[in-house]
Each structure stands twice: as C-alpha cells, then as structure tokens.
A protein has these predicted regions:
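Catalytic and binding regions of secreted/periplasmic enzymes and modules that target cell-wall glycans
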Residues: 42-113
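Hydrophobic alpha-helical bundle architecture
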Residues: 15, 21, 38-42, 64
Length: 113
C-alpha cells in the first residue's frame, strides 16, 4: 500500500474512532517518522507502522495473534488500545492542538513518558 493510501486510511480510521483532527494528524506524523508510513517495515529501530520494539512488539504480536506483520487496521487498533489504556499516555488526550504531536512524539514514540 502506498504511503498516501496509508495516510488516508489512518486519518479515516482515527477520526471514526473519536480522535480529534489534531490527534489524528499527530498519529500520522508519528507513523511517518517511525516507518515512512510502511506498515510492514522492519529495521534495527523497530517493527511495523510505529516501530514497536521489545515488550510492546511482543504485545502487538499477541494482540494480532500473528508473529508476522499485522494488518494496518490491527496495528491502529493496538496503538489505540495502548494510548487509551496506559496512564502514561494520558497527556496526549488532553494536549492542545499545537502540543498533540510533541506530546505523542515524546511519550508514545519512546514507549514511555
């Protein structure tokens, strides 16, 4: 899937799942930095859309019930699950439109705040 198609799918999915436009944009920007919007890319810095590593990557594999690359929708659902269930990411939900991306980058991008 081409990067523009991934971007469009992500924006649509995130908006349908109650992300504000600035939160959805922040998620797309983060995925672009992590993977170039390539959902199945693997590198030394991480795997798949959000370059998951370590225990987060293992948790995603369990969530998706696959050791290989999960589908894009599954990766988005897992990211959503992480963001909504981990108290460390609460700042993202309360961030102003100009702070949503920096907060997401600092916390979610590193897997912790």
């Amino acid at each position: 899937m081409a990067a523009e198609a991934v971007r469009a799918f992500m924006l649509s999915w995130l908006l349908v799942h109650n992300y504000s436009p600035h939160q959805a944009d922040a998620m797309v920007r983060q995925a672009d930095i992590e993977s170039g919007l390539q959902p199945c890319i693997r590198s030394r810095s991480g795997s798949w859309l959000f370059a998951w590593t370590g225990s987060r990557r293992v948790a995603l594999a369990r969530y998706a019930d696959t050791p290989g690359c999960p589908g894009l929708e599954t990766q988005l659902a897992f990211a959503d699950h992480e963001l909504r269930s981990e108290p460390a990411y609460a700042g993202f939900w309360g961030a102003s439109s100009d702070r949503a991306f920096p907060v997401l980058r600092r916390c979610f991008g590193r897997g912790r705040c």
